[in-house]
Amino acid sequence: MRFSTPIEISPLPFQLTPQSRIVVLGSCFAEHIGQRLAHALPPGSVCVNPFGVLYHPMVLARALAMIAFAPDFPEDVFFEGRDGLWHSWWHSGAFTAPTREECIRQAEEALKEAQAVLEKADLLILTLSTDHGYYLKETLSCGSLVANCHKMPSKMFEEKVTSLEQSISVWESLLPLIKAKFPQLHLLWTVSPYRYAKHGMHESQLSKARLHLTIDHLIHSKVANANSLHQENESMGLTDKSMLCKKISESFAKNSEIFGNCSEFFEKMSENLLKKSEIFSSNLGRDQEDCLPSMQKAAEESSDVVTSSLASTCDTWQHYYPAYEILLDELRDYRFFAPDMLHPSEQAVDYIWEKFRFAAFSPELQDCASQLYSIRQALSHRPLHPESEDYRLFYTQTQQRIEKFAQRFGFIPK
């Protein structure tokens, strides 16, 4: 007799190794999973939410474009709040500072760290949370869609539900560019199990359904999966920055709410892409169904492209992990929710994490993570009698374990 409906998860088509590099973007749930990944891998291997916690699919798309193509932040992204502190419309409240200069410094440092990890990354995890977005009524060059309202007056914003078509359009414009620049990358989508009671439970379910439909469309989209196309078509060499910039601008033309009128943004994106390749399809927007495999080939031939450290068994680069279903369909009990009855509890996050670990970790990384945990437990031990013979033996054995671990995995546990 069974009293639950377990979500059966087969091993993912790729396997993480101790050499893997991972970027995690998204909601609070992404933060929890990202922190656990950071504890299982060498220091500096995982970058978690370099823009802070983000919820909206198009806000995530903008953050990913910034990380991937390294444009400068628009001037009016940074502003002084009514609390006298400086904030960013593109970041969460984690990027708050007493001065504009300090706020910009924090944002730029986090961006550089994320860019360094993404350049070598073999896995990108994106967690979508809601398609309810907040838009500034005032027109700014950085666009009107904000990542966070930063406790500014509600009269400054308009809340809107992003259409399924617009979310798909943004990502179908961006993902082929991401895959062209980072051909070694795998993308893992998840939907946050957090429930938005403020929208009403019915609307919360509708919002999650739209996010699921967006992800499912992108995973099966020819446009978003430019690396798996096999159709032979004529290509044009877009070696001129203005031509490529025009193509990219046209791709995102319908989404000025996200990027605003950032001509410099698209110029920088074009310049960055041209460093990777001299050949791109003439159809970078919605017409990318016919783009050439040469788009990927040219990027792969770049001298600084990193070979994936994933143990991969598949050709597709987009995948889905059912974190939402594990909580809502398998656990489906309020004892697995936090006291607010909306967020998953720590126990639920641990359960979802354990399932992910067994689905995504290679045997080598499983061993590495287990040894790391055990060694850290030993290092955190506070002896009652540090001069005793038992503690001296324990200390010596721990140091020997650390040395063996470092010899095998190439870093010292801390």
Model regions: which residues?
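Conserved SGNH/GDSL esterase-like catalytic core that processes O-acyl groups on lipids
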Residues: H32, P43-L126, T130-K137, M156
